[in-house]
């Protein structure tokens, strides 16, 4: 028997009204390479994170920048204050592995593994009293 699906978002586990989430599934980048970039922006303000992603010369930074802009748009849609947003969670989970065979000498073949990622960015509003100077 399957799990009962809850249609009301407020009853889902882990849902908070002051958060905005953006998820990219099956990204064609290794989780290890994506984590290198996501570790840099975790905990930062949204503006600072966007600047960092623009200057980091990695392909994962372009993917994360696009996903962060999507999360910001989701926050704007929910009516959150964009000036108080920070990155609460930025993770790259392992996705499926695409396998293909490359022919080699003497009738052999070697397997090439193309690793995919599921990247999640969660933005949250800073509480009113905890503003930084």
Swiss-Prot record:
What subunit structure does UniProt give? Part of the 50S ribosomal subunit.
Is-annotated flag, keyword Kinase? no
The record ties this protein, via InterPro entries, to:
Ribosomal_uL22 (IPR001063), Ribosomal_uL22_bac/chlpt-type (IPR005727), Ribosomal_uL22_bac/org-type (IPR047867), Ribosomal_uL22_CS (IPR018260), Ribosomal_uL22_sf (IPR036394)
> Which GO MF terms does the UniProt record name?
rRNA binding; structural constituent of ribosome
Which family is it part of? Belongs to the universal ribosomal protein uL22 family.
Query: In its keyword annotation, does this UniProt entry include Transcription?
Result: no
Gene that encodes it: rplV
Biological process per Gene Ontology, one example term: translation
Give an example GO cellular component term for this record: cytosolic large ribosomal subunit
Explain the purpose of this protein: This protein binds specifically to 23S rRNA; its binding is stimulated by other ribosomal proteins, e.g. L4, L17, and L20. It is important during the early stages of 50S assembly. It makes multiple contacts with different domains of the 23S rRNA in the assembled 50S subunit and ribosome. The globular domain of the protein is located near the polypeptide exit tunnel on the outside of the subunit, while an extended beta-hairpin is found that lines the wall of the exit tunnel in the center of the 70S ribosome.
- PROSITE patterns, A to Z: RIBOSOMAL_L22 (PS00464)
Keywords (A to Z) from UniProt: Ribonucleoprotein, Ribosomal protein, RNA-binding, rRNA-binding
Tell me the Pfam families matching this sequence: Ribosomal_L22
Q: Which domain of life is it from?
A: Bacteria
**What is the recorded name of this protein?**
Large ribosomal subunit protein uL22
């Amino acid at each position: 028997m399957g799990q009962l699906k809850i249609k009301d978002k407020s009853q889902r586990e882990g849902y908070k009204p002051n958060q905005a989430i953006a998820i990219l599934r099956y990204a064609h980048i290794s989780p290890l390479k994506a984590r290198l970039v996501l570790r840099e922006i975790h905990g930062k303000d949204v503006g600072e994170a966007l600047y960092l992603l623009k200057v980091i010369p990695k392909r994962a930074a372009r993917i994360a920048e696009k996903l962060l802009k999507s999360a910001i748009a989701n926050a704007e849609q929910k009516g959150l204050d964009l000036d108080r947003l920070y990155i609460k969670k930025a993770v790259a989970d392992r996705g499926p592995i695409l396998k293909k065979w490359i022919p080699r000498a003497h009738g052999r073949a070697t397997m090439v593994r193309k690793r995919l990622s599921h990247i999640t960015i969660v933005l949250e509003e800073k509480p009113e009293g905890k503003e930084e100077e």
